[in-house]
Regions:
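Conserved short histidine dyad/triad with adjacent acidic residue
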Residues: 48-67, 101-104
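Short, conserved beta-strand element in jelly-roll/cupin
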Residues: 57, 66-82
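A short hydrophobic beta-strand segment most commonly corresponding to one strand
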Residues: 99-100, 113-122
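Short beta-strand segments in beta-sandwich/barrel cores
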Residues: 62, 79-83, 97
Length: 122
């Protein structure tokens, strides 16, 4: 059901101090972030109040921390297991996403057996 323009403005996130920008992700240098196991490689764009990233996890990657930050995460390639500290686990394949608020009741962390490539905005 379509929402009115006014309804979209009320419900949307305020992205501020981010001028129109085109990003060639292949030209963005990757930074290396070791996990508890494996490695994450981040290509990051930051402006204003947002951070957008292409993140590639090596096979066997397990995050070294439980995360409380809110994200919109979209799986571009591979398969990702998102573990919640409360014991729940969700498997996401290419074309799937999750959304989580800042300081959610159950922090999350990432694991992948085969490797994964993600697009994340936070």
């Amino acid at each position: 059901m379509p929402r009115s323009r006014a309804g979209l403005e009320e419900a949307s996130v305020r992205i501020q101090q981010v001028p129109f920008t085109v990003t060639d992700w292949s030209a963005v240098a990757a930074s290396e972030h070791p996990g508890e196991r494996g490695t994450a490689f981040w290509r990051t764009f930051e402006a204003g109040n947002i951070r957008a990233r292409i993140v590639e996890y090596s096979p066997g990657y397990l995050a070294d921390h439980w995360c409380n930050r809110g994200h919109v995460l979209y799986v571009l390639e591979g398969e990702l297991e998102t573990q919640l500290r409360d014991g729940r686990t969700f498997t996401l394949k290419a074309g799937m996403s999750y959304q989580v608020e800042d300081d959610a009741p159950a922090p999350h962390r990432s694991f992948t057996k085969t490797g994964a490539k993600l697009f994340i905005v936070d």
